[in-house]
């Protein structure tokens, strides 16, 4: 209940702040944006979100708990916090997509959790001690954790976006 009220208050505050930016004056000319808007990759993102149809609501609740228990110490909010001397590669959808090999699918993330490699795919992070081993969790738990990561990376705009977004 509290979070719903907080969300409504935050939305109202944002609307008031945006309205206040106009300074009471209405502009009659359109300004060109200073930077082009980012172009979404709908085919790639929809493929990833399509994978989520394989998860029930109960699966995703369990997945969140598993992520928090097994990954949450180092990956709060999808960001990497330097444990195991990491290079601070986040779990944002873009970071997962641009990894070598790509980790933006459930199968790709399960593979990573079984055999973690550096972002460029060249270094075995188990051998260097830079990542924990999750092989003992079994395929189903790894699949659930991967589902949680994909869900957050495709639906939560703050996921993996920096250390200040906790």
Swiss-Prot record:
Pfam families from the UniProt entry: Cytochrom_C550
Q: What are this entry's molecular-function GO terms?
A: electron transfer activity; heme binding; iron ion binding
Signal peptide as annotated in the record: 1-32
Cofactors demanded by this protein: heme c
Q: How does the record classify its membrane topology?
A: Peripheral membrane protein
Descriptive protein name: Cytochrome c-550 2
Q: What role does this protein play? A: Probable low-potential cytochrome c, might function in photosystem II (PSII).
* Gene name linked to the record: psbV2
Q: Which domain of life is it from?
A: Bacteria
Q: Matching Gene3D superfamilies, A to Z?
A: Cytochrome c-like domain
Which organism does this sequence originate in?
Answer: Gloeobacter violaceus (strain ATCC 29082 / PCC 7421)
Question: What is the cofactor note?
Answer: Binds 1 heme c group covalently per subunit.
Q: Which UniProt keywords apply?
A: Cell inner membrane, Cell membrane, Electron transport, Heme, Iron, Membrane, Metal-binding, Photosynthesis, Photosystem II, Signal, Transport
Task: Please list the GO biological process terms of this entry.
Answer: photosynthesis; respiratory electron transport chain
Would you tell me the Gene Ontology cellular component terms?
A: photosystem II; plasma membrane
In the record, the note on similarity to other proteins reads: Belongs to the cytochrome c family. PsbV subfamily.
């Amino acid at each position: 209940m509290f979070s719903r009220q907080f969300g409504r208050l935050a939305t109202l505050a944002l609307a008031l702040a945006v309205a206040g930016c106009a300074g009471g004056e209405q502009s009659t000319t359109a300004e060109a944006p200073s930077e082009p808007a980012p172009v979404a990759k709908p085919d790639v993102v929809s493929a990833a979100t399509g994978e989520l149809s394989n998860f029930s609501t109960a699966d995703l609740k369990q997945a969140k708990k598993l992520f928090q228990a097994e990954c949450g110490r180092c990956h709060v909010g999808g960001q990497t916090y330097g444990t195991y001397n990491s290079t601070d590669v986040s779990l944002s959808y873009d970071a997962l997509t641009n990894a070598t090999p790509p980790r933006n699918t459930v199968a790709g993330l399960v593979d990573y959790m079984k055999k973690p490699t550096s972002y460029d795919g060249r270094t075995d992070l188990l051998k260097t001690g830079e990542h924990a081993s999750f092989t003992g969790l079994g395929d189903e738990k790894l699949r659930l954790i991967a589902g949680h990561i994909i869900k957050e990376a495709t639906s939560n705009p703050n996921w993996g976006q920096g250390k200040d977004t906790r």
